[in-house]
Amino acid sequence: ANVKFKYLNPTDLAQAMATKLIDAMVGSEPWAINTENLCGASVHELGNSSGLGSTFPIVIVASEKALKEKGEALERFLAALDRANEYILSDWDDAMAICASHTGLSVEDQSKGSGLQFFELGFNETDVQSIAMTAMYLLDLEKIEAVSVIMDHVDLRFLPGE
């Protein structure tokens, strides 16, 4: 079979499926729920990564130059993310209403999709294991030649409370 991969803005995924511009989509929440809601019974979730035992952390990457020249701005950015996470956890319903106003989902669906995620700032042993697990999979597929020691490439200095 001939498969063509096409990058789309996540906000366009549901409409692309509904208009048959694409035959399948891969995306994180809330875009999967949004697609299921718009397309109804014409689409089917074939699988998701929720049972893999991985946190799939979102990693922030910065150059040495950026760390030296804009370290304070990075610290402020991370502090803002930390405050946002605290707000989400302390006032879930209001936070989901705010998110839903930007994603186009109902508050209920936004809450469902967001409920699959962790809202914390940090990097712990579970995250290291998650990245290592993904790296081992890529190694098995021969997409990479070796697995690095993850913590050799992680700098925790800029995290709040570190």
Would you name each region that the model predicts?
Residues 1-9, 19-23, 107, 144-150:
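A local structural motif
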Residues 11-101:
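Pocket-lining segment of extracytoplasmic ligand-binding domains
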Residues 12, 71, 123-127, 148, ...:
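Solvent-exposed, flexible loop/coil residues
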Residues 15-17, 57, 121, 157-162:
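Short, solvent-exposed polar/charged micro-motifs at secondary-structure junctions
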Residues 30, 49, 113, 150-152:
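Residue-level "edge-of-site" marker
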Residues 35, 53-55, 117-118, 150, ...:
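Short secondary-structure boundary/hinge segments and terminal tails
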Residues 68-144:
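Secondary-structure end/capping motifs
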Residues 138-162:
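Conserved C-terminal helix/tail region of periplasmic/extracytoplasmic solute-binding proteins
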